[in-house]
From Swiss-Prot:
HAMAP family: Adenylosucc_synth. It comes from Clostridium perfringens (strain 13 / Type A). InterPro entries: Adenylosuccin_syn_GTP-bd, Adenylosuccin_syn_Lys_AS, Adenylosuccinate_synth_dom1, Adenylosuccinate_synth_dom2, Adenylosuccinate_synth_dom3, Adenylosuccinate_synthetase, P-loop_NTPase. This is Adenylosuccinate synthetase. Disulfide bonds: none annotated. GO terms for molecular function: adenylosuccinate synthase activity; GTP binding; magnesium ion binding. The gene is purA. GTP binds at residues 12-18, 40-42, 305, 331-333, 413-415.
Amino acid sequence: MSAFVVLGAQWGDEGKGKMTDYLAEEAEVVVRFQGGNNAGHTVEVEDKQYKLHLIPSGILHDEKLNVIGNGVVVDPKALFTEIDYLEGLGVKVTPEKLIVSDRAHLIMPYHITLDKLKEKARGKNDIGTTCKGIGPCYTDKYERSGIRVCDLMHKDSFAEKLRINIEMKNGYIKLLGGEELNFDEIYNEYMAFAERLRPYVKDTSVEIYNAIQADKNVLFEGAQGMLLDIDYGTYPYVTSSNTTSCGVASGAGIGPNMVTNAVGIAKAYTTRVGKGPFPTELENETGDWIREKGHEYGVTTGRSRRCGWLDLVILKTTTRVCGLTSLVVTKIDTLAGLDKIQMCVGYELDGKVIDYFPASLEDLARCKPVYEEFEGWGEEVADARSYEELPENAKTYLRRIEEFTGTKVSIVGVGPKRNQTIRVREEL
């Protein structure tokens, strides 16, 4: 029995989509357990590029069951747009390949409207939301006023809950200067969604449990990254769900003891999108060089990513919080060509060196990175297909990551394509 989770070990955008696609070859079931279509994964297979937001990366493989779990918030319009996009690229998306939890909460038009209005109202204190309605949907979920997929399957129940929500939300929308929403328009649109969605809807918790009990390999695909976790991230510049391994059990509907391995995905450097402290950020030519060579622009928003040196304090924190059993280091190819490479091994705060990630943003903003310097590797590594083919300086860099975090590197990424992947160890 093997059930393992793939998680972002930094601020997201670490290459989880590619690695999930790669590891999906060994899995029979691939599960999304949190987030929504605010996530963005890019996967390159042969000469085709696929951009995924909501559907698990395993959809690119035939004979894999892909699951959108109860912890995910689902925008039906975005879901069907993605299905149509994939089928246009020749990828079949049928109810035999994709199922959606009947307990998942629905993103409604008023969630998106409120997301935009509230972000605008924050002014210079905006939190960098993608304005996809994710946060307001999770708010309704925990406020117990949300509408779930199972509600959509019963038109009378859906109509009643929708009417109550629209009456309440329109008052808030009006207060924020927006235009009130129309019940009939939303009801009719979602009734059309209901008929198309119905064949995909199942009790996904049962399906996942049965797969694990049948000794099938189940891969849980995390979205965003550990530092965007609602509890352990750089709050309030975070997402609205639990992005750590702790979120798998509740977001997929299984016992925590069923997940046997946790694989953390980390870039060979660090990036983040939006506001918030970033101790190793490079606001210079080197940072610009990394951004351009690594094509560091968001899949969902197109926003440029802030770039900096690899921060081992972050990776050590992720290892502790998520119980990582191994690390995957991606984009080692991006650093090829730099004469010197630095790696953060601690923070100086108030005259003391610490090796943990402070909860307070004010404290984090005052942290000065303590660096170790490494010799770069001039050779391009995009064609390397084994660990032995990597430059010695790159191996030294990887060994230091293992030493500091106490976690083995199992896979190294040397490019965006599926075959640009080096398996260092079979064990995850």
